[in-house]
Design a protein with these regions (language model features):
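Boundary at the C-terminal end of the N-terminal hydrophobic targeting segment
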Residues: 21-26
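Positively charged n-region of N-terminal signal peptides that target proteins for export
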Residues: 1-5
Length: 442
C-alpha cells in the first residue's frame, strides 16, 4: 500500500471512535487454540475456508507436520543443529533447543552501554492521540474475543470499546564497546523492546557483545522500542504493528531515530544496507512491513513467529486480509478489489484479493524468519476467516519469497510454540550473523 492508505486508515480509526461506547463489559473469554465455531473446513471453494489437513489437534494449538503437502519443501536438519550461516531457503530444526553459547555474558568480552529514555503520545505527531481499548478487568484481549464480525464478512472485526488515549514507552539504545561518538554506525531497530518488552534482561545486547567481539557481525547500535500498549485489534500495539502501511516506519524515522542520535551522541547510517529491523509476532510483521514499505530505509529483516495474518484493524477495504495478503489471496466472497490513491478508494484492475509479493517487483529485502510447529491457530474464537493460522501464513511467505527470488532463510521449529523462548535462545546468534552477511558498512 502507498502512503495515501495511511491517511485512509487514520480516517477509519477516527470513524471507529465515533461509535458509542459499550454499556456493559463482556465476560472474560480465553484465547482460542482450535477450529473456531462456525468455521468452513469442508468446502475449499467456499469463502473463508480453513484447511485442517495434516494438523494434530491432540495439542493446543495443533501441531503442524512440516511435511504437509501445502508447505514448501524444506531441509530437515539433525536435532541440535542449525542451517549454515550462508544457506538460503527452508529448514526444519528441533525438537530440542539448547541455548547458544553467545547468549551468556563473558568476562573477557567488552560490553556495550545501554541508554534508556521515555517518550509519550504527547511527544508524537503520527501517533497522537493513541488508542486505548476497554477490556474487562484482568481479562487480556477480552473485548476482542467477544466482538462480532461484520455481516457476511468473517474477516472484519467490529467492536466499539476502543477510544483515544495516551501511551508512554521506553526506548533502549545499545551502543557497542569502542564506539566513537559521532561516527556513522549501522543499526538494528526492534519492536516489543524496552524494559518490559520481549527481551527480558536485554539478552539481545549480550548476544551482540559476543558476536561483535568475534567479528561475526559489524559493530552496531541496537534500538529497542517499547510497544504502544495492549495487544491485537483496537490497541495501540495492534494499530502500529499490524497495519500494512508505511506509518510505523515513518514514525521511527521521524520521531524516534532523531531522539536516539540526540540522547546517545550517535550518527545512524542512512545507507539501507546498514539498517535492519527485527520483531516478534506482530512486531515481526511490522519489521517486514517497514522494509516492504520503505526499502530505501531498510533492507534486512529478522522475525520470530511473524504475524503475517489478518490482524490489521480497522478493516481496510483496500487490503481486506491485512498482512495475510502479502502471500495469499483474500479468501472472502468475490467482490470488487480496491486500491487507494490520493485518499480516494478506486476500483483496481487486479483480480480480487491479489497478494502483494507475487504481484510486485522484487524488493531488495533479506529476510530471516521462524515459526513453531505449535504456533498460534485462530486465537480469536470469533474470527473464522481462513487467515489466522500462523504456521500456514509463514510457510506461505516462504513459498512466495522463493518464487520471486528473494534472499531468505526460513526456520520451521519442531516442539516450539509462538515466539518460543528456547528456540530464540538457540537460533538468534546465528540468525543475526545470517542477517548481516555481506553488509558493506563495518
Amino acid at each position: 500500500m502507498n502512503g495515501a492508505s495511511v491517511f485512509l486508515a487514520g480516517a477509519l480509526v477516527s470513524a471507529a471512535w465515533l461509535m458509542p461506547a459499550a454499556t456493559a463489559q463482556p465476560a472474560c473469554v480465553a484465547a482460542n487454540a482450535s477450529v473456531p465455531p462456525g468455521a468452513n473446513t469442508a468446502d475449499r471453494s467456499a469463502p473463508f475456508f480453513i484447511d485442517t489437513a495434516g494438523l494434530d489437534f491432540s495439542t493446543a494449538p495443533p501441531t503442524r507436520d512440516p511435511a504437509n503437502a501445502g508447505y514448501p519443501r524444506a531441509t530437515e536438519l539433525p536435532d541440535g543443529t542449525l542451517p549454515p550461516v550462508g544457506a538460503e531457503g527452508n529448514f526444519i530444526i528441533g525438537p530440542n533447543h539448547r541455548p547458544a553459547p553467545e547468549t551468556v555474558a563473558q568476562d573477557n568480552v567488552p560490553r556495550g552501554t545501554i541508554h534508556t529514555f521515555t517518550i509519550t503520545s504527547g511527544d508524537s505527531v503520527i501517533y497522537n492521540p493513541g488508542i486505548v481499548r476497554d477490556d474487562p478487568p484482568n481479562c487480556r484481549n477480552g473485548s476482542v474475543y467477544t466482538a462480532e464480525t461484520a455481516p457476511g464478512d468473517k474477516s472484519n472485526l467490529v467492536f466499539a470499546t476502543s477510544h483515544p488515549g495516551t501511551w508512554t514507552r521506553t526506548i533502549d539504545v545499545y551502543v557497542p564497546a569502542g564506539y566513537v561518538p559521532g561516527s556513522e554506525a549501522p543499526f538494528i531497530v526492534f519492536g516489543d523492546g524496552g524494559a518490559t518488552g520481549a527481551y527480558p534482561g536485554r539478552d539481545l545486547f549480550t548476544i551482540l557483545d559476543n558476536l561483535i567481539q568475534q567479528r561475526r557481525v559489524p559493530p552496531m547500535i541496537a534500538i529497542g522500542i517499547g510497544a504502544g500498549g495492549q495487544d491485537a485489534q483496537g490497541s495501540e500495539r495492534g494499530r502500529e504493528y499490524d497495519a500494512v502501511s508505511g506509518a510505523y516506519a515513518q514514525w521511527v524515522e521521524r520521531e524516534v531515530l532523531p531522539l536516539v542520535e540526540q540522547n546517545v551522541g550517535a550518527k545512524l547510517t542512512r545507507n539501507p544496507d546498514g539498517r535492519a529491523t527485527m520483531g516478534i509476532s506482530s512486531s515481526g510483521a511490522a519489521a517486514f512491513t517497514m522494509a516492504w514499505s520503505h526499502p530505501e530505509l531498510y533492507q534486512r529483516v529478522l522475525a520470530y513467529s511473524p504475524t503475517m495474518v489478518n490482524q490489521q484493524w480497522p478493516h481496510d477495504t483496500a487490503l481486506r486480509g491485512g498482512a495475510w495478503e502479502y502471500h495469499a489471496n483474500w479468501p472472502g466472497p468475490t467482490g470488487p478489489n480496491l486500491n487507494v490513491a490520493v485518499n480516494v478508494v478506486t476500483p483496481s484492475e487486479a483480480p480480487a484479493g491479489t497478494p502483494l509479493i507475487p504481484n510486485s517487483p522484487p524488493k531488495p529485502i533479506r529476510f530471516w524468519f521462524e515459526v513453531g510447529d505449535q504456533d498460534l491457530f485462530y486465537p480469536n474464537p470469533v474470527m473464522a476467516d481462513g487467515m489466522h493460522d500462523w504456521a500456514l501464513a509463514d510457510e506461505g511467505m516462504a513459498k512466495v519469497l522463493a518464487a520471486k527470488g528473494y534472499r531468505y532463510q526460513f526456520v520451521f521449529a519442531r516442539n516450539a510454540k509462538h515466539v518460543d523462548r528456547p528456540t530464540v535462545a538457540q537460533t538468534l546468534p546465528s540468525a543475526l550473523e545470517w542477517l548481516w552477511k555481506g553488509c558493506s558498512i563495518q
